[in-house]
Amino acid sequence: NNKDIALIDVTGKQPIVNLTESGYTDVNPRWALDGKAMIWSSDRAGYRSHGSWGAERDYYLMFFDLDAYERFHMNKEELALADTTKAADKKDAPTKDKKAKSKKNAKDKKTDEAPATKPLVLDLDNRFDRIVRLTAHSARMGDAVLTPKGDKLFYQATFEGGNDLWEQDLRERKTRLLTKQSGGGEMFLNKAGDNIYMVSN
C-alpha cells in the first residue's frame, strides 16, 4: 500500500487534492518558499521495497507557483539581475496621492485589527511539470529542511549504520557531509535559516 500526500482545504469548501499520485510511497511533506512549494520524500527513484525489504528515498520539491519555479532555476548572476530589476521597478512605481495615504494611515491608527493576510493562489494544474529532485543520491532518509531562500537542503541519510547530517547546495550542485552519527529526529530551521534544531531521542 503506497502513501500519497493530500492538500486539504480547512474550510471544507474545496475537495481534497492528491498532490503526488506517484504509485509509490510519498511522505514527510513540508511547506517551502513561503507556501509556494513543498518538499517531501519519495521512494520513486531509489531502491524500492517491492519485496518488503525496505526502500531508499530521495527528497523532492514541488512548485505551486511559476515565478518561484523559474527563480529556483536561476544561477547567481541571473538572481542578482532579477533582484536589481525588481528593486528598480519598485522605486520607479508611481506613488499614491499623499492625502489619500494620509487618510488611510489615520484610519489604520484607529483600529487595532491586524492587516488581512493575502491568500496564496496555488497553481495545482501544472504541479507535475514543476517537480525537482533535490538529493543527489538515494538513501535511507530521515528528516530534511529547506532554507527560506531555497538554496540549501539539509537532510539525514543512513549509509553506514547510523544517520548522518548532509548538506546539498542547490546553487553550486555540491553535496557535503556535515556530521557523522548525528542521530535521527525531526529538524527545524530558525527564521534566518542559519541554525538547525533537532528533536532526537
Regions found by a protein language model. Give the residues of each.
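Blade-edge beta-strand/turn elements of extracellular beta-propeller
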Residues: I8-E21, R127-L134, R173-L178
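A flexible loop/linker signature enriched in serine peptidases of the S9 family
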Residues: N1-A6, G12-K13, T20-V27, D34, ...
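Intrinsically disordered, Ser/Thr/Pro/Gly-rich linkers and terminal tails that flank
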Residues: K101-K104, V132, N163-N201
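Residue-level marker for the onset of beta-strands and adjacent loop->beta junctions
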Residues: D4, R130, R140-G142, D164
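Conserved beta-propeller blade repeats
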Residues: N1-N2, E21-S41, Y47-R48, S138-Q156, ...
